């Protein structure tokens, strides 16, 4: 009985071993087949990795290029903006300068026209024979009567001071004098005028004192008075030449 069991066991073991051997032989891979599969796996993984990194590198390069392009556009926009602002400023400056030139020209034209109108009005209102640019009160003589206008500002107000009468006599004598040198025959009248000035130094300080407190001579006083009333003398002498002023006109 023991033998029978032993044989049976041995038979089972052999059958199992044979079956396992066949299974191993059908599933076992040879070294060459294994190496080929390993190489394919490595190459596939490398290709995938290269593709991935190539794609990432391309994305990085594209992003960098896009940033550079954007930077260039920003710089270009800034330059264009500065150029436009500069152009606008220049145009505004030119416009203002043109406006100022136009305004100056218009003002000059208006001023010229205004002066011309004033001159025309004066010319139209001025009596014939009256010195140009002077009204009756400002003329040295009255063209209607031919008399000296003692109210003329050109006489310096000396005809109405404390020594007004003495001034009128001396002045009338000088402007109508026909001697050479002119006025030499009026010395006595100028001496009388100077004597009157000395009585009223507060009124005739400028005429009576020459450069300080020293009293001026009759000749100096005469010179100062005639120099002050020189515009009136010129007008009256011209009026005498044109026979518009009466010789030896008596003072008021």
From Swiss-Prot:
Co-factor requirement: Cu(2+); Zn(2+)
Keyword Transit peptide: yes
Disulfide bond entries: 152-154, 163-196, 173-186
Positions of the UniProt region annotated as Disordered: 90-143, 230-252
GO biological process: protein import into mitochondrial intermembrane space
Domain CHCH: residue ranges: 160-204
Keyword Disulfide bond: yes
Mitochondrial matrix side: 32-37
InterPro entries named among the record's database cross-references: CHCH (IPR010625), CHCHD4 (IPR039289)
Textual note on the cofactor: Cu(2+) or Zn(2+).
Pfam families per the UniProt record, alphabetical: CHCH (PF06747)
Biased composition (Basic and acidic residues): 90-123, 239-252
One GO MF term attached to the UniProt entry: protein-disulfide reductase activity
Keywords: Disulfide bond, Membrane, Mitochondrion, Mitochondrion inner membrane, Oxidoreductase, Protein transport, Redox-active center, Signal-anchor, Transit peptide, Translocation, Transmembrane, Transmembrane helix, Transport
TM regions (residue ranges): 38-54
Boundaries of the annotated transit peptide in chain numbering: 1-31
Superkingdom of origin organism: Eukaryota
Localization in the cell: Mitochondrion inner membrane
PROSITE patterns (UniProt xref): CHCH
Topological region Mitochondrial intermembrane: 55-252
Membrane-topology descriptor: Single-pass type II membrane protein
Protein's job: Required for the import and folding of small cysteine-containing proteins (small Tim) in the mitochondrial intermembrane space (IMS). Forms a redox cycle with ERV1 that involves a disulfide relay system. Precursor proteins to be imported into the IMS are translocated in their reduced form into the mitochondria. The oxidized form of MIA40 forms a transient intermolecular disulfide bridge with the reduced precursor protein, resulting in oxidation of the precursor protein that now contains an intramolecular disulfide bond and is able to undergo folding in the IMS.
Domain note: The CHCH domain contains a conserved twin Cys-X(9)-Cys motif which is required for import and stability of MIA40 in mitochondria.
Assembly notes: Monomer.
PANTHER family xref list: COILED-COIL-HELIX-COILED-COIL-HELIX DOMAIN CONTAINING 4
Name of the protein this chain belongs to: Mitochondrial intermembrane space import and assembly protein 40
Organism: Candida albicans (strain SC5314 / ATCC MYA-2876) (Yeast)
Gene that produces this protein: MIA40
């Amino acid at each position: 009985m023991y033998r029978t069991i032993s044989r049976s066991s041995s038979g089972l073991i052999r059958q199992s071993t044979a079956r396992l051997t066949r299974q191993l032989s059908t599933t076992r891979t040879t070294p060459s087949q294994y190496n080929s599969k390993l190489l394919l796996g490595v190459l596939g993984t490398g290709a995938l990795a290269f593709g991935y990194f190539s794609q990432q590198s391309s994305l990085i390069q594209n992003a960098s290029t896009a940033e550079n392009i954007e930077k260039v556009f920003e710089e270009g926009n800034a330059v264009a903006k500065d150029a436009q602002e500069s152009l606008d400023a220049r145009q505004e400056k030119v416009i203002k300068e043109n406006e100022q030139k136009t305004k100056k020209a218009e003002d000059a034209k208006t001023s010229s026209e205004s002066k011309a109108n004033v001159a025309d009005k004066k010319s139209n209102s001025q009596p014939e024979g009256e010195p140009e640019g002077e009204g009756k009160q400002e003329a040295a003589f009255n063209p209607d009567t031919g008399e000296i206008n003692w109210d003329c500002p050109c006489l310096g107000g000396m005809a109405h001071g404390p020594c007004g009468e003495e001034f009128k006599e001396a002045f009338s004598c000088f402007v109508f004098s026909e001697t050479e040198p002119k006025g030499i025959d009026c010395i006595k009248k100028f001496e009388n005028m100077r004597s009157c000035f000395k009585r009223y130094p507060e009124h005739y300080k400028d005429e009576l004192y020459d450069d300080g407190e020293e009293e001026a001579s009759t000749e100096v006083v005469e010179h100062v008075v005639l120099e002050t009333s020189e515009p009136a003398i010129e007008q009256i002498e011209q009026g005498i030449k044109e026979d518009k002023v009466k010789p030896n006109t008596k003072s008021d």
